[in-house]
């Protein structure tokens, strides 16, 4: 695990964006050998997308040879709905960079056969070999994508029933009316995420502190989905100060010193 303890949400966003750009540029993608990037939606990554757009406009990166796979999508919510994850991604990221439309992959929550759609998505990922970097956020209960507490840690892309906590949390995007929030979603599985070459999770705000504690100091437990990433060879957790509040002082000190010792070396992004 690589734990990046920062001070502010803006620092988290800038660090994450620069890490993504470094990975893409170091990979030197081509049309025949694209960089495969997994992406989330929600409030946490929004500033990271804004920073990526800024750096793209500054000529620091091109997304022309990047293929993206999003984590999830609501079921039975039209793509053109302002709160669909299709709309979120195009409005907040894709419309502002040079990514090719055919390289964008988002689950179709309006298909008649959800199982077939989930299988198709898994096969599409496999056709590229693997996802090189999957960025995600984490819920207050430790869920990643829509892998709610008690999800199988070997699960694949599938349809999930959303918990009441998730419905309440997401109601802020639906006029604070929980009845408007779709009750089902298609989501990548925990196993799908673990297959990625690298996973980078962003956590900001004091409400994420217990999830961060579970990810860093807790045991692997299907009630805290994020804890499964302890098994991943290249797991990066980037947090602001508020999200570190439940960690032991010596834990934060250890990782802070560790980051300082590798800064500027070839091991910094390992």
UniProtKB/Swiss-Prot annotation:
Pfam families: Glucosamine_iso. It catalyses: alpha-D-glucosamine 6-phosphate + H2O = beta-D-fructose 6-phosphate + NH4(+). Pathway: Amino-sugar metabolism; N-acetylneuraminate degradation; D-fructose 6-phosphate from N-acetylneuraminate: step 5/5. The active site is at 72 (proton acceptor), 141 (for ring-opening step), 143 (proton acceptor), 148 (for ring-opening step). The keyword Hydrolase applies. One of its GO terms (biological process) is N-acetylglucosamine catabolic process. One of its GO terms (cellular component) is cytoplasm. Allosterically activated by N-acetylglucosamine 6-phosphate (GlcNAc6P). Disulfide bonds: none annotated. The record marks 151, 158, 160-161, 254 as: Part of the allosteric site. Keywords: Allosteric enzyme, Carbohydrate metabolism, Hydrolase. It comes from the Bacteria. Transmembrane segments: none annotated. It is an enzyme of class 3 (hydrolase). Its EC number is 3.5.99.6. GO terms for molecular function: glucosamine-6-phosphate deaminase activity; identical protein binding. Catalyzes the reversible isomerization-deamination of glucosamine 6-phosphate (GlcN6P) to form fructose 6-phosphate (Fru6P) and ammonium ion. Belongs to the glucosamine/galactosamine-6-phosphate isomerase family. NagB subfamily. Homohexamer. This is Glucosamine-6-phosphate deaminase. It comes from Haemophilus influenzae (strain 86-028NP). The lineage of its organism: Bacteria, Pseudomonadati, Pseudomonadota, Gammaproteobacteria, Pasteurellales.
